[in-house]
């Protein structure tokens, strides 16, 4: 299937888009800083998006 965020010729996000896929990417844009991207397993220390990357960095307290 064709990804609407991706320019298939150069395999990069289309002009005006931030990202193609990832846990902190939705509708071709980075999710806002502070958006939970990985729920904690009982300790309450969730992992959060940074707003500048598609990665979901691990909480430093995990």
UniProtKB/Swiss-Prot annotation:
Main location: secreted
Residue intervals of the Disintegrin domain: 1-62
UniProt motif Cell attachment site: location: 41-43
Tissue: Expressed by the venom gland.
PROSITE patterns reported in the protein's UniProt record: DISINTEGRIN_1, DISINTEGRIN_2
UniProt KW keywords: Cell adhesion impairing toxin, Disulfide bond, Hemostasis impairing toxin, Platelet aggregation inhibiting toxin, Secreted, Toxin
SUPFAM superfamilies, sorted: Blood coagulation inhibitor (disintegrin)
Covalent S-S links between cysteines: 5-28, 19-25, 24-49, 37-56
Gene Ontology CC: extracellular region
One Gene Ontology term of the molecular function aspect: toxin activity
Cellular compartment(s): Secreted
Subunit text: Heterodimer with subunit B; disulfide-linked.
Family label: Belongs to the disintegrin family. Dimeric disintegrin subfamily.
Function: May bind to both alpha-IIb/beta-3 (ITGA2B/ITGB3) and alpha-V/beta-3 (ITGAV/ITGB3) integrins, and may inhibit platelet aggregation.
Name of the protein in question: Disintegrin schistatin-like subunit A
Origin species: Echis carinatus (Saw-scaled viper)
High-level lineage: Eukaryota, Metazoa, Chordata, Craniata, Vertebrata
């Amino acid at each position: 299937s064709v990804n609407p965020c991706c320019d298939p010729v150069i395999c990069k996000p289309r002009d005006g888009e931030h990202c193609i896929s990832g846990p902190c990417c939705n509708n071709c844009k980075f999710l806002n800083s502070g958006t939970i991207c990985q729920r904690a397993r009982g300790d309450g220390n969730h992992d959060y998006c940074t707003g500048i990357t598609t990665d979901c960095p691990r909480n430093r307290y995990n």
